[in-house]
Regions:
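A conserved structural/catalytic subdomain of Rossmann-like adenosyl-cofactor enzymes
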Residues: 1-451
């Protein structure tokens, strides 16, 4: 992983696209290049999804990472459209080798040969293009020379000819890291918010449907015997879309009783705290804990969270929600700074805020506040392996979002290859006089229709 720890990761692509799985099958059959052996070479045709489908940490990305970090990817050649029978999609040839010559080691060549073709005299389904012998020779020579060739535009501004670039393996890699912002919440007990607690969050719609039809009967054991067949048929209906585990859960009386107990506990809190609107969620949770303690109500962590989530919501005017206040001695601060590559005064950029600086009463110098992050405001950045994560944060994030911090534990390593990124050529806008003359010519051909439309 990012910290250098070995890990077992997913290397299975999605079931709808098995191209990379077939490629890995071929990789597994490669002969060894050790002990003077020649090793193996692979040429495999893919569509564009193999280049970039899958986020960091996904099966597709991990397969690309495995191939590139082992230095097996030699080159990728983009082919012209309509080169294959019955498909017009863009295709690519992946060239792999486990015995690269020294000059190609640690590098990957990308060749854009999408404009290297000649038209067939007669179409074969979607196939209307082919390589000429000269095209093949040009592509082969570009590969053998490991040449860097700049793409060209013709007189009409359209791409023409071949283009080629050579990259270091790590140029295709990136770190994906979460950018967190503090949660700010308002809270208020209301009849509507408490009523929602009657139902489990994961089964809210289904439980509501059942309760509307049968009411408080759902809390009686004989209900599940009396309507056993009807309930089973209802739960298994395609309309409800319930999994086996969900069907079992919703037809278990304990599920209903547990939710009823949670709702009643919330009513107790409501009676004690009233319907006051709290703009400081930290104060609100303290009051909730005091009421629970006074009434000797013991809630599981998930039950407590369900109540708090039901009666609170994000509001940018609220106070920041404190997750915890921790004590960091000098050795712990040094360890964190070494891990994050920062100075003690920069720990706030990694989610550790000096308690004295953020207004915590009676805070000690070695106490730090850790805020709850807002899932609604969470963002992620993809940062090249060639750039430091913290340097990127200071340059691209901190100037725009002062409250943001890096979640360094969320880092995932990804790999993707974008031909458009490397071979895109800007096409200059056409001259206005040229456009006007073309319109006038079309006007003549259309018997003045365009002139009438333009009011001229």
């Amino acid at each position: 992983d990012y910290w250098g720890n070995p890990q077992v990761v997913d290397a299975t692509p999605r079931s709808s696209d098995g191209q990379l799985l077939f490629l890995m099958e071929m990789v597994s059959k490669m002969k060894s290049s050790r002990g003077g052996e020649k090793g193996s070479r692979i040429a495999s045709v893919h569509n564009g999804s193999s280049l970039f489908t899958g986020d960091a940490g996904s099966g597709e990305s991990n397969i690309r990472r495995h191939i590139i970090e082992n230095d097996w990817l030699d080159a990728i050649i983009q082919l012209p459209n309509n080169l294959f029978y019955n498909t017009g999609i863009t295709t690519y040839i992946w060239l792999l080798s486990n015995n690269k010559p020294s000059e190609r080691q640690g590098k990957v060549q990308l060749i854009d040969a999408s404009q290297m073709y000649r038209k067939l005299k007669k179409n074969l389904g979607s196939k209307n293009s082919e390589f000429s012998p000269q095209d093949i020779a040009t592509i082969t020579q570009a590969y053998l020379d490991m040449a860097t060739i700049r793409g060209q535009l013709d007189a009409k501004g359209e791409p023409t000819g071949i283009a080629s670039q050579v990259f270091a393996n790590q140029d295709f890699g990136y770190h994906k890291v979460n950018i967190e912002r503090p949660d700010r919440r308002h809270a208020q007990f209301t009849a509507e918010s408490i009523a929602k607690l009657r139902f489990d969050n994961s089964l809210s719609d289904a439980m509501n449907t059942l309760y509307e039809q049968y009411g408080d009967e759902v809390y009686q054991a004989e209900f599940y015997t009396k309507y056993k067949n009807d309930l089973k048929k209802w739960a298994e209906s395609e309309e409800m879309g319930l999994s086996l585990a969900q069907r079992k859960k919703i037809l278990d009386i304990e599920t209903w009783k547990n939710q009823l107990a949670i709702m009643n506990h919330a009513k107790t809190l409501w009676e004690a705290l009233g319907d006051v609107l709290y703009t400081d969620f930290n104060l609100f949770t303290k009051k909730v804990e005091n009421v629970l303690k006074t009434h000797d109500i013991k809630l599981k962590a998930n039950e407590r969270k369900q109540i708090l989530d039901a009666v609170s919501w994000y509001d940018e005017t609220g106070e920041k929600v404190i997750k915890s206040i921790t004590t960091l001695k000098a050795d712990k601060i040094q360890a964190l700074c070494e891990r994050f590559g920062c100075q003690p005064e920069q720990l706030a950029d990694f989610g550790y805020y000096p308690a004295q600086d953020v207004g915590v009463e009676n805070a000690k110098p070695d106490q730090y506040v850790i805020y709850e992050s807002s899932s609604e405001l969470r963002d992620s950045e993809s940062i090249s392996l060639n750039q430091g994560i913290y340097d990127y944060f200071l340059a691209e994030v901190r100037p725009h979002v002062s409250e943001a911090w890096l979640d360094m534990e969320s880092i995932k390593i990804g790999y993707e290859i974008s031909f458009n990124k490397y071979f895109y050529q800007h096409r200059p806008l056409r001259n206005l006089d040229e456009v006007a003359n073309e319109l006038l010519q079309l006007d003549k051909e259309a018997d003045g229709l365009i002139r009438d439309i333009l009011g001229g």
